Amino acid sequence: MIEEGLLLPMNVLLQGQKLTLLDPEMWFLRGNENKDVTLVITIGNNHQKLMVVEDILLLIDRSQIEVTAGKVIYHPLRIDILSKLLAFIDESTGSVEREHHELFADALPFASEVVLFSKVASEAWFLATYLSSDNINEILFQHLRKTECYKLVRYLLSQSLIQTSLYDLGELYGVSYSHFRRLCSYALGGKVKTELCGWRVARAVLEIIEGNSDMTTIAHKYGYSSSSHFSAEVKSR
């Protein structure tokens, strides 16, 4: 059940233990399990103290975490799922990456633990959160925009109309071909070429529905040899 949603297996940090995060992470902590906990989160010479008084989503940047009191019981969350979804939303609205605020850890009150057990439920919760007018949610969106997954999906979407190889995409992104494939597999949650082909089909179908041009013209625009080739691709999905 855990493996189907955002919630990953429980971890524990004891008093005095330290943990170094190399990438932004998101944790779920239950207030009743972490009543006497104090965390100190450090980046360089900057320190931030955090105490847990309720169920929270803990958003942590690249940093070192030290437990100075109590025992931390937490579940890491699959940040890639929400980062990918936000990347699609931002791409569709033409949003540009905003400046990040100065804090490198934030605790957001979270009373919807049940949604974390299902990918569908968590995505529905996230979309509802995005559409709400509560400004505090912008902290979550800013955090997700810091992730490699978000940046990679935005990059792939920006390049999706260009007929180019994964090798060339990786080179332009600034990493080796093998590392680029690994990054893409994690960010997309599946086979890279299959996912990119799916995006191409979806964009082409959307243009046809919107009536922007005829099928043959759109098929050629998206790299299909003919309208028959495009139709066959759509039917295969």
Q: Each predicted region: which residue ranges?
A:
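Solvent-exposed, amphipathic alpha-helical segments
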Residues: L103-F110, E148-Q159, R203, E207-G211
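N-terminal regulatory/effector-sensing and dimerization cores
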Residues: M1-R98
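Amphipathic alpha-helical segments enriched in hydrophobic/aromatic residues interleaved with Lys/Arg
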Residues: H75-Y130, N137, L152-R154
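Terminal helix-turn-helix DNA-binding modules in bacterial transcription factors
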Residues: Y186-S226, S231
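Key DNA-contact positions within bacterial/archaeal DNA-binding proteins
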Residues: S178, R182, S227-S228
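Short, contiguous hydrophobic alpha-helices characteristic of membrane insertion segments
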Residues: E233-S236
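Short, contiguous, well-ordered secondary-structure segments
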Residues: A107, L166-D168, I218-A219
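Short, Lys/Arg-enriched, Trp-marked, Pro/Gly-tolerant hinge/linker segments that flank
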Residues: S112-S176, Y186-G198
